[in-house]
Swiss-Prot record:
Manner of cofactor binding, per the entry note: Binds 1 [4Fe-4S] cluster. The cluster is coordinated with 3 cysteines and an exchangeable S-adenosyl-L-methionine.
Active site: E100 (proton acceptor), C350 (s-methylcysteine intermediate)
Organism: Saccharophagus degradans (strain 2-40 / ATCC 43961 / DSM 17024)
GO molecular function annotation: 4 iron, 4 sulfur cluster binding; metal ion binding; rRNA (adenine(2503)-C2-)-methyltransferase activity; rRNA binding; tRNA (adenine(37)-C2)-methyltransferase activity; tRNA binding
The protein, known as: Dual-specificity RNA methyltransferase RlmN
Catalytic activity: adenosine(2503) in 23S rRNA + 2 reduced [2Fe-2S]-[ferredoxin] + 2 S-adenosyl-L-methionine = 2-methyladenosine(2503) in 23S rRNA + 5'-deoxyadenosine + L-methionine + 2 oxidized [2Fe-2S]-[ferredoxin] + S-adenosyl-L-homocysteine; adenosine(37) in tRNA + 2 reduced [2Fe-2S]-[ferredoxin] + 2 S-adenosyl-L-methionine = 2-methyladenosine(37) in tRNA + 5'-deoxyadenosine + L-methionine + 2 oxidized [2Fe-2S]-[ferredoxin] + S-adenosyl-L-homocysteine
C-alpha cells in the first residue's frame, strides 16, 4: 500500500525577491507584472506583510497570494540598546541559529550593519564571528529581512515616516562574497526605488578578498566597496586574514581597482579598513608600508581600534600608537579616519559580533580553493573545499 503525502507545497517567500524575480512569480500566476511593484512597495516601503492589508490588490488575487506565498522576515528574539544609542538585534534564522545586526547612529546619519552568513569560514584571527565556526549562507529574505526588522523597530515605514536608516554596510557576520547571489539581490533591494531607495553611495559591501567573486561583482551591482585589509604586507596578512594565502594583497587590490574603475567618477574610491592591534600591526613602519602600498589607488582609510572579545589574546591599540599611525597616513596625503568604538558595552562593536551558530558542519580553520576553477576564466561555479571536505560554492547566476 502506498501512502501519498498530503503536505501542502511550501509557500514562496516574497520578502527577498528582486523586482525581476517577483515579476516572474506573477507571470507564473498568470497575473500582470505591475503587481510586483505594488507588492514591493507594500512590503519594503509600508512594512505590510499581510496580503489582506494590501488594499490596492484585488480580493481574488489577495486570496490567491495567501495560498501560494508569504512575506516573512526573520524574527527578532532579543534587542540591546547601548548607552551611546547603538542598538543590536539578535535575529533567529532557523535551525537554532541566530545572527546579529547593529544600528549605529551618528548625528543625522544612521548606519545598519547587516550579516550575510551564519558564522564565517574565513577565521580572521581578530574577529569573534570566525571563532563561532560556519553553518550556512543566509537567504536573501534573511538578509533584507534584517533591514526590514530594523526599519520596523524605528517606525520607518509608511508615508512621511522619518528615515532613521540612512546607510547600510555589509560588514556583519560572514563574508558577503561567499554568499554572492543572495547578497547582491539584497543590496539591490536596498537601493531600489520601490523598496528602501538608498543611494548607491550609501550601501557598502566589505570583503576580506574573495577575488573571483569580486571580479564578477560589477556585473551585478555598483554599490560602494570596502576592503578588509588590516596589514600592509602578505606575511602579516597571512596571519591575520588567512584567505590572503590564496588571494594575496596584490591580486586583491588589482581586482578592487577594476571594480571601482567601473563606478561613476563621484564614487570611484574604495575604503580600506585597517584594524589596529597593539604590537601586531600598529607600528610606524606598518603605516609607512601601507602608504606606499596604496599610493596608486584612490582610497580613503578607516582605522579601527581592535575591540577585545573572549578567546582572543590581542589587545587594543594605545591612543598614542593610533594617533601616530593616523598622522603618518595623513602626512602621506590620505584621507584617514578613525572609527569611533560604538556599542562595545553590548558587544556590538566592530569585530565583536558572534550570534549563535549551531551544527557547525562546515566549520573550517582553513580552506582550499580548486585551482582549476580559478584558472577557468569563464567558470560559473568556483568550489571552495574546507578541511573537513564539506563544500561551499560561489555561484554566479547571470
Amino acid at each position: 500500500m502506498t501512502v501519498e503525502s498530503t503536505a501542502a507545497p511550501a509557500k514562496v517567500n516574497l520578502m527577498g525577491l528582486s523586482q525581476a524575480k517577483l515579476e516572474a512569480f506573477f507571470d507564473s500566476l498568470g497575473e500582470k507584472r505591475f503587481r510586483a511593484t505594488q507588492v514591493l512597495k507594500w512590503i519594503h516601503q509600508m512594512g505590510v506583510t499581510d496580503f489582506e492589508q494590501m488594499t490596492n490588490i484585488s480580493k481574488p488575487l489577495r486570496d490567491k497570494l495567501s495560498q501560494v506565498a508569504e512575506a516573512v522576515a526573520p524574527e527578532v528574539v532579543n534587542q540591546w540598546d547601548s548607552s551611546d544609542g547603538t542598538r543590536k538585534f539578535l535575529i533567529r534564522v532557523g535551525g537554532g541559529n541566530a545572527v546579529e545586526t547593529v544600528y549605529i547612529p551618528d548625528g543625522d546619519r544612521g548606519t545598519l550593519c547587516v550579516s550575510s552568513q551564519v558564522g564565517c569560514s574565513l577565521d580572521c584571527s581578530f574577529c569573534a564571528t570566525g571563532k563561532q565556526g560556519f553553518n550556512r549562507d543566509l537567504t536573501a529574505a534573511e538578509i533584507i529581512g534584517q533591514v526590514w526588522q530594523a526599519a520596523k523597530s524605528f517606525n520607518q515605514f509608511g508615508v512621511g515616516a522619518q528615515r532613521k536608516i540612512t546607510n547600510v554596510v555589509m560588514m556583519g557576520m560572514g563574508e558577503p562574497l561567499l554568499n554572492f547571489d543572495n547578497v547582491v539581490d539584497s543590496m539591490n533591494l536596498m537601493m531600489h526605488d520601490n523598496c528602501y531607495g538608498l543611494s548607491k553611495r550609501r550601501v557598502t559591501l566589505s570583503t576580506s578578498g574573495v577575488v573571483p567573486a569580486l571580479d564578477k561583482l560589477g556585473e551585478y551591482t555598483d554599490a560602494c566597496l570596502a576592503i578588509s585589509l588590516h596589514a600592509p604586507n602578505n606575511a602579516l596578512r597571512n596571519e591575520l586574514v588567512p584567505i590572503n594565502k590564496k588571494y594575496p594583497i596584490e591580486m586583491l587590490l588589482a581586482s578592487a581597482k577594476r571594480y571601482i574603475d567601473g563606478l561613476p567618477d563621484v564614487r570611484r574610491k574604495m575604503t580600506i579598513e585597517y584594524t589596529l592591534i597593539d604590537q601586531v600591526n600598529d607600528r610606524p613602519e606598518h603605516a609607512h608600508e601601507l602608504a606606499e602600498l596604496l599610493k596608486d589607488i584612490p582610497v580613503k582609510i578607516n582605522l579601527i581600534p581592535f575591540n577585545p572579545f573572549n578567546l582572543s589574546n590581542y589587545k587594543r591599540v594605545s591612543n598614542n600608537a593610533l594617533r601616530r599611525f593616523q598622522q603618518i597616513l595623513i602626512d602621506a596625503g590620505y584621507t584617514t579616519t578613525v572609527r569611533t568604538t560604538r556599542g562595545d558595552d553590548i558587544d556590538a562593536a566592530c569585530g565583536q559580533l558572534a550570534g549563535q551558530v549551531n551544527d557547525r558542519t562546515k566549520r573550517s580553520q582553513r580552506y582550499k580553493i580548486d585551482k582549476n576553477a580559478l584558472d577557468a576564466s569563464n567558470a560559473d561555479i568556483i568550489p571552495v573545499k574546507l578541511v573537513d571536505e564539506a563544500d561551499v560554492s560561489i555561484t554566479f547566476n547571470g
